[in-house]
């Protein structure tokens, strides 16, 4: 049952729910969630109830991501939480960009450490602060397995995140090419405009190479501070649309991993404020 609830929070399901006519398979996935609430309660309240059950009985990666985002934004409300960011040869589970930026790799009790070395190497090329998030039971193993500059956060039995070891910052591990590749073209241009007054002076086909050459001439500490500024401001319109939609707190990680139009976010918000009874299905969820 709890796995069915976890499936309802996937970005694939949530994206489908934002469409004008969600497919039957998505409605079936949501049916297990809707059944948890009084039929007249909003579907969003049912998602919050389902999430509470996941926290209590099935601490999957989604739970770790959501609690990490909530805790990070409580500490720094103006920060930006990004989910599933490609970084060098890996994909960071969560990146939080505020006054500083931190890349987080989540290892639940269902995960192995087999790829951890490569993942941490990738993140360390782009972020001063890198952390691994594990259950309390895996803290000692994580402390022994990761480099000394990598922080370790523990997810305890009360669903709180505590710091077993803070990360160690510094620019020496950063790679300018990796920083450049994480940034989008508009972000690169914004950095170069602020730093050297640059505006595009070559055809679009040559702009990547031209901006790369100019970016590499920046001092690493300057480039990194600008990198953090751009990540903090990334997808600001998306975040405004998410806030306007009034999504339930339990949807934080799903929303952070999606890019939708403003209309689609509004449609999703309307759906989650509608009665749960509309999403009860007699057929069982698809496998």
Task: Say what each PLM segment does.
Residues 94-110:
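Conserved catalytic cores of phosphodiester-cleaving nucleases, focusing on short active-site segments
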Residues 218-287:
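C-terminal, charge/polar-rich interaction regions
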């Amino acid at each position: 049952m709890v796995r069915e609830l976890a499936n309802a929070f996937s970005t694939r399901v949530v994206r489908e729910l934002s469409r004008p006519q969600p497919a039957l398979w998505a409605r079936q996935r949501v049916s297990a969630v809707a059944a948890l609430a009084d039929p007249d309660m909003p579907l969003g309240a049912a998602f919050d109830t389902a999430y509470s059950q996941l926290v209590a009985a099935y601490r999957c990666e989604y739970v770790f991501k959501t609690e990490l985002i909530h805790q990070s934004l409580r500490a720094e409300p103006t920060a930006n939480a990004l989910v599933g960011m490609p970084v060098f040869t890996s994909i960071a589970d969560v990146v939080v960009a505020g006054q500083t930026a931190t890349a987080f790799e989540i290892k639940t009790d269902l995960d192995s450490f087999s790829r951890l070395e490569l993942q941490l190497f990738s993140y360390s090329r782009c972020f001063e602060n890198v952390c691994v998030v594990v259950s309390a039971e895996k803290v000692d193993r994580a402390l022994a397995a990761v480099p000394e500059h990598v922080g370790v956060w523990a997810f305890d039995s009360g669903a709180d995140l505590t710091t077993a070891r803070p990360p160690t910052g510094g620019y020496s591990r950063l790679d300018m090419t990796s920083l450049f590749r994480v940034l989008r073209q508009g972000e690169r241009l914004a950095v170069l405009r602020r730093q050297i007054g640059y505006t595009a002076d070559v055809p679009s086909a040559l702009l990547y190479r031209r901006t790369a050459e100019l970016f590499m001439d920046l001092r690493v500490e300057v480039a990194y501070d600008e990198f953090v500024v751009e990540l903090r401001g990334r997808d600001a319109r998306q975040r405004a649309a998410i806030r306007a939609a009034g999504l339930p707190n339990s949807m934080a990680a799903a929303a952070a991993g999606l890019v939708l139009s403003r209309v689609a976010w509004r449609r999703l918000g309307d759906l989650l404020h509608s009665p749960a009874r509309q999403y009860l299905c007699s057929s069982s969820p698809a496998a």
